[in-house]
Amino acid sequence: MTSIMRTRVSRAWTALLACLSVLALVALTAGCGSARSYGRTQLTVWSWEPSMPQLVKGFEHDNPDVHITLVTNARYEELNSAIQDGYGMPDIMQLEYFALPQYAVSGQIRNLTTRTDGYEAFYTPGSWASVGMDGNVYGLPMDSGPMAFFYNDTVFKQAGVDASKIRTWQDYYDAARKLKTIGVNITSDAGEASFFDAMVWLAGGKPFTTSRDGHDVGIDLLGDAGTQEFARFWQRMVDEDLIDTSTTMWSDAWKKAVGDGTIASVFAGAWMPSLLLADVPGTAGLWRVASMPTPNGNATNAENGGSALSVLTSSRKPDASWRFIDYVCHSRTGIDTRVKGGAFPADVATLDSPEFLSRTTVTDSHGVQVPYFGGQQFNRVLSEAAKHVSTQYQYLPFEVYARSDFRSTVGKAYTWANNWQRYRMEYQRMLAGKTGNARNPQSPGLMVTIEDGLSQWQQNLREYGINQGFTVTDN
């Protein structure tokens, strides 16, 4: 073979190899999802936070070496399935405060204590306590939900009640009776576990305890003073038909009742303003915010809601994951983005800032500023509420299950109360000859009280805990 021919063959092979290399690179890039993400650290984040797409975009801009895949529709069921299967877990998961201990005790989320030195003073006591167990830190607070009293001022005034002066549970009961005279329920509760837990917390209850090593669990729903105090108070409200026990919060029926004033107030977390505006826009200007009434009027409070970002133990990219959650939860940019999107902050600086405290409007989905609370500087009330959250309440290390079981146990008391009210109404209509039926209406059956439900709930929780390998005691 001549030198000319060898040169031509060599050039041909070189060209062919170059083409193959390009094709291989294209195939590899396609396998990664896009050319934009090739060569970058890949993180998967599961979060339902509305502002998260904007946060991801901002983080990627500041950290071009990281590409994030955001999944917005995955919750605990999907996470538990992925953990059980051993694959498909995200690197970072948004966890509500009540759920975090369950994943910390089981070793599914990373201990971040060494990364968070000096962070405690940055956050409110309630939110910081919610990401810790046994002196260790398992996430960064993303938002918080100190309880507050949201009420339709116009409806309360129609009943002759100044809701801003309600300080104690007795005041609240008296107001409920006056509202009932004009055909209005002071609130609704169809048996919500999160609400029940928050009210027990508010009353100083400590029905659940977990040992420092996470192995021993105490459950005392029947003997705990705070639990029993709220159960007795709420049973009185239910027995006297002062609350709506048939309408589930966030349902269409609930939105209608809140909108027409037949449900006059809500005990909820400080995240409520943007949701009230979204769900009941027609009552803008009628509502106000006050601090929570407590058993004796003391300035104590509880959390209802709030969440953190945690890094999964299974993640092989803990450093990049930490950079992301620190950006979202600790940087000024991340916090401001979430607060502008309607989240209630967990950090002290925002809660104390003049701009935040002086706000009189709520931002709707189109960016319009709406004076939903009639010009009130509502964040002053909510910021103060955050400062009074007690830090002694503990969630169960299987709280996700506990809340799912609440409706089938304690919830039966609300169902019975609803059936009893229906029976009474039908019976009275029958006596008045308005039914066209001489037979008695269907009986609601044996009475079920909140105390009965708590007894069954405690039994179920005890059995579940033992089956999960915990040592469970009835304190």
Name each model feature, range by range.
Residues 58-123, 157-160, 255-257, 261-265:
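Extracytoplasmic "Venus flytrap"/periplasmic binding protein-like
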Residues 81-84, 90-91, 120-155, 185, ...:
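A structural signal for short loop-to-beta-strand junctions that line the ligand-binding cleft
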Residues 272-283, 297-303, 311-409, 472-474:
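C-terminal lobe and pocket-closing loops
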Residues 97-147, 199, 288-290, 381:
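Hinge/lid segment of periplasmic solute-binding proteins
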